[in-house]
């Protein structure tokens, strides 16, 4: 058995004949296809529905010094979220795709929705505000995907929903800064 130094081993390895190795590089891209757009729309619809539930439960349970104004605002918010959910879902159907048939399927389309876990008004409304902003960013992404796919109806409705969500976040931020 021969003992070699590390330098000898490396030199032998460098001088050894080599074979050309072909490596395939796998690149994952988001193609602008109707299927991918619909997948994104169903996920966004799920998010809107869960946002509707969150706003509705906050509407019932929030207790704060400006309860009447917050209660009224949240009532309008959950109604808007439901209308936005309906709009996106109808657009999915207009593209000849199906929406999930049950609540489990709908919630599986967006699994990591941040839930309010406290009855503290400030904490609950702060999380809801963050969820509004996250939803608005999802709507922006949907606008871009719709533009790439050539779906101007989806693009326009998603832009409108984006505005609704950012406006709601702005109003809540102003409320949270002011009096709670």
List the predicted regions and their residue ranges.
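Conserved alpha-helical segments that form or flank metal/cofactor-binding pockets of metalloenzymes
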Residues: 68-105
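A structural signal for well-ordered alpha-helices, especially hydrophobic packing surfaces
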Residues: 45, 52-55, 59, 85, ...
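Acidic/histidine-rich alpha-helical segments that form the ligand environment
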Residues: 58, 104, 108-160
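Acidic, proline-/serine-/threonine-rich low-complexity intrinsically disordered repeat tracts
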Residues: 14-32
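Short linear clamp-binding motif
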Residues: 1-17
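Disorder-to-helix initiation segments
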Residues: 27-44, 114, 121, 125-128
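Helix-loop segments that flank and shape redox-cofactor active sites
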Residues: 33, 50-76, 138, 142-153
């Amino acid at each position: 058995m021969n003992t070699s130094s590390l330098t000898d081993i490396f030199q032998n390895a460098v001088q050894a004949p080599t074979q050309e190795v072909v490596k395939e590089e796998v690149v994952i891209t988001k193609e602008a296809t109707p299927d991918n757009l619909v997948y994104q729309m169903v996920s966004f619809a799920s998010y809107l529905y869960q946002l509707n539930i969150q706003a509705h439960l906050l509407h019932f349970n929030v207790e704060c010094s400006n309860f009447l104004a917050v209660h009224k605002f949240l009532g309008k918010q959950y109604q808007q979220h439901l209308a936005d959910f309906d709009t996106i879902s109808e657009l999915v159907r207009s593209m000849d795709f199906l929406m999930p048939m049950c609540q489990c399927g709908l919630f599986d389309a967006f699994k990591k929705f941040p839930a309010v876990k406290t009855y503290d008004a400030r904490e609950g409304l702060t999380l809801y505000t963050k969820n509004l902003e996250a939803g608005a960013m999802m709507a922006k992404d949907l606008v871009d995907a719709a533009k790439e796919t050539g779906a101007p109806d989806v693009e326009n409705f998603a832009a409108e929903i984006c505005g609704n969500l950012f406006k709601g976040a702005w109003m809540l931020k102003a409320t949270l800064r002011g009096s709670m």
